[in-house]
Amino acid sequence: MLIVLSPAKTLDYDTPAHTEISSKPDFIKQSAELIKILRQSSPAQIASLMRISDPLASLNANRFAAWSPKFTQKNSKQAMLAFNGDVYEGLDAASMDAKQLAYAQSHIRILSGLYGVLRPLDLMQPYRLEMGTRLANAAGKDLYAFWGNTVTETLNQRIAEQQSEALVNLASEEYFKVVKPALLKAPVITPVFQDWKNGQYKIISFYAKRARGLMARYAATKGIKRPEELKSFDVDGYEFDAAASNEKTWMFRRKVGI
């Protein structure tokens, strides 16, 4: 079983990593190509391109300027420990033990606008580049064109290596759009998390994002190898709803926490 996650906008490079184990990203050459393009933009242009504030644009212009094709413990941090958004609050990688980290490294992949695909322990230099950014490049008008089939082929390689029964999609629509399900060598299962509010079940963004991280952590904690085992996920009051699910979309619902 292979799980894919989205990255996070917020990063934590201040907290020391609790493990020295790391790997290098597979697509440093491609990342360098994107960095070269991004360095041509002023902070004002970055603010417009990414629809972010001027201070954030300046921060990221400095990040792009400092980016190096050489990844070290000084300029980088393991991706799963550097990301710090809602998903990663649920994942809580900083409290994972060696066995759980090893599971994550084997069974989880993080989709990234700059790095394409990251293993959880791949060293990552700080950046902000969302997959939906319309950054023109030699391959086309945006990052989906830039990455082409690369991400799908990389996932297929891992699927073949571990003889995965399915790809579990815990990423957002924006990020999973870089994956081409028709070319994948395993079916895609997408867990959906809903909360009861105002008389109906609905997706509440913060809770749904956090639940994706919780499910990835659940898989690592239990050492899950088969997707069917995820139906037992019961963290924070969520339960699998068979009646509302189908082969491709698995519904997990709860009536508490709101």
Swiss-Prot record:
Superkingdom of origin organism: Bacteria
For the biological process aspect of GO, one term held by this record is: response to hydroperoxide
Annotated GO CC locations:
cytosol
In terms of InterPro entries, this protein maps to:
YaaA (IPR005583)
The similarity comment for this entry is: Belongs to the UPF0246 family.
Query: Could you tell me what this protein is called?
Result: UPF0246 protein mma_1385
